[in-house]
Regions:
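Non-catalytic terminal/accessory segments
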Residues: 1-541
Length: 541
């Protein structure tokens, strides 16, 4: 096979092939820290006997710091900024492996995970045998019950009426090779900038099989993915990524931020490269054929079918795993190797799905990395968005230097719905303030205004209950230290919308407090979701 990373000289066919029959069970061991040493060839480039795509599962030591997540519960938010040793086995951990979908893995899948952890070059055969009727049933119940139907028009409730018989038939078709993937139903959803984003809705049976296959493949790739990678992974949600970025900038000597955006990432994933990357770990030809069926099933829009030669539908169950695998080889491993080989100063990396932020101490490193990154993406059919990719001066030392020069404060950048601002604590120390992005807030208010208009025919109690749940959901994500003013802005806007709603129902002239119950005011002020520190006054809506 062709050289995938430019530094690797080992093809998938040279790796060991492992057969897994699910005959044993192992405990939940974490990934060891040790990584493979890099050697230098005559040209001065890093070379490794093992491909750097098989680097041992060491978390990114400059990115993922030890800080309790705002929403993470009792678990630690991320690994330490410095070198760290993971607990090899924790007695409090359950024997069964937790997955992104919360589906319990079988004993055989525990063996797959154990083998993937111990041997980074192993290629797995007979993986499709782990797609059992039990796993398909669990995958069916893990799907959203109110999700929109695909091209087949099948809903979850209709399939559930005779799901046992249908699951058995689906299982037989998968293992006979007669299963056929259906095209995705394309719909369009609005983006914050006013443009439309294509969304692919898979047929129900395709969702079930994709969910089951994702559970199987997660056992392998969760042992390969690096600590800098977040998004659509067990225990690595948005708040953990935000905390990792916060601690990385706060504790490291960061003076420059590269806020990068990949143009149309899901629509431009190269199928050939993706399959080559998958073959580094998968030797099961039946499973590879199944993955090809989903990639090349095409899309259906307004009753017209069109082939898909590139990209994966955004919204498909398997697409997040595809994206993480693709960027693991194209971006993550390459960035870590570039940092060790070419960087002069410290570099931090945090990636959430296709959205990533890089922090640099030296400006020369930032400019060199940006140029090398453009070349790297071109090789694999990707492109950085020229208008949304920015290199800005940001961080503790950036703020100090700009203050000495008499310049304006450092620019801000948005990441995962929050605007990051260089600020100071009450004691005068440097800190990073994070507030809800104003575009997100305005978009949410507009969305609720339109939805309230559609619910004019409903009774007030039903609408009030819905509005209260929407506000609670917003607070559960956006209630972080320093974001109190943004939450209050949304609360005030929703109260105004609710007041107008009551007036349209014949309550003209009455005060909101004396009219129908206020669903926003019914939320207690001492709600845990609103226990956040005060921030500087935010922008008005």
């Amino acid at each position: 096979m062709s050289n995938v990373k430019g530094e690797s000289d080992v093809s998938p066919t040279e790796s060991k092939t492992t057969r897994t029959d699910g005959s044993f069970s192992r405990g939940n061991w974490e990934i060891p820290e040790t990584s493979l040493p890099l050697e230098m060839d005559r040209s001065g480039k890093a070379r490794c006997h093992h491909p750097d795509m098989h680097v041992a599962g060491k978390s990114d030591s400059l990115v993922v710091p030890a800080k309790q997540a705002n929403k993470a519960g009792p678990q630690t938010a991320a690994e330490s900024v410095e070198e760290r040793r993971l607990t090899k086995e924790n007695a409090s951990q359950p024997l069964l492996v937790r997955t992104q979908s919360r589906v319990i893995k079988s004993r055989g899948l525990l063996g797959v995970r154990e083998t993937a952890r111990k041997d980074k070059k192993a290629r797995f055969n007979n993986l499709l045998n782990h797609v059992t009727t039990e796993l398909l049933q669990a995958s069916f119940f893990d799907l959203k019950k109110n999700a929109a139907p695909g091209i087949d028009g099948e809903t979850w409730s209709a399939y559930a009426e005779d799901f046992e018989t249908r699951i058995i038939d689906l299982h037989n078709r998968i293992h006979r090779g007669s299963y056929r993937a259906k095209p995705s139903k394309r719909t369009w959803i609005p983006k914050l900038d006013g443009k439309l984003r294509p969304l692919g809705i898979a047929a129900l049976e395709d969702k079930i099989v994709q969910q089951a296959v994702r559970v199987v493949l997660e056992c392998i790739y969760e042992e390969d993915f690096l600590g800098l990678s977040y998004g659509f992974r067990p225990g690595r949600d948005c708040h953990r990524a935000l905390d990792a970025l916060y601690m990385g900038i706060s504790r490291q000597k960061v003076s420059w931020i590269l806020d990068a955006d990949i143009r149309g990432f899901f629509d431009n994933i190269n199928h050939d490269w993706l399959l080559k990357f998958l073959e580094h770990r998968i030797a099961d030809r039946r499973l590879l054929r199944l993955l090809k069926k989903w990639l090349r099933a095409g899309v259906s829009e307004d009753g017209k079918w069109s082939p898909s030669t590139v990209g994966t539908p955004q919204g498909a169950v398997i697409s997040p795993l595809f994206s993480n695998v693709f960027l693991h080889y194209v971006l993550d491993l390459w960035l870590v190797a570039w940092r060790k080989r070419d960087a002069v100063g410290q570099v931090i990396i945090v990636r959430y799905a296709d959205d990533f932020v890089l922090g640099f101490r030296e400006e020369i490193d930032a400019k060199r990395c940006l140029g090398a990154l453009k070349e790297r993406f071109t090789k694999f059919g990707l492109e950085l968005h020229p208008e949304k990719t920015r290199l800005i001066e940001f961080g503790r030392y950036a703020a100090e230097r700009r203050s000495r020069r008499g310049d304006t404060p450092p620019e801000t950048f948005d990441f995962l719905g929050f605007t990051h601002i260089c600020g100071k604590t009450r004691k005068g120390d440097f800190t990073i303030k994070r507030i809800s992005a104003i575009k997100k807030l305005r978009s949410k208010v507009k969305e609720l205004k339109d939805e309230l208009r559609k619910r004019m025919h409903m009774d007030l109690a039903t609408v009030g209950s819905w509005l209260r749940s929407v506000y609670r959901g917003w607070c559960q994500y956006h209630a972080i230290p320093g974001n109190y003013d943004r939450l209050q802005q949304l609360r005030t806007a929703l109260q105004e919308l609710w007041f107008r709603r009551l007036r349209r129902r014949g309550q003209r002239g009455r005060r909101l407090e004396t009219a129908e119950p206020n669903p926003i005011k019914m939320i207690r002020q001492d709600d845990k979701s609103q226990q956040v520190d005060p921030a500087r006054p935010g922008q008005s809506l």
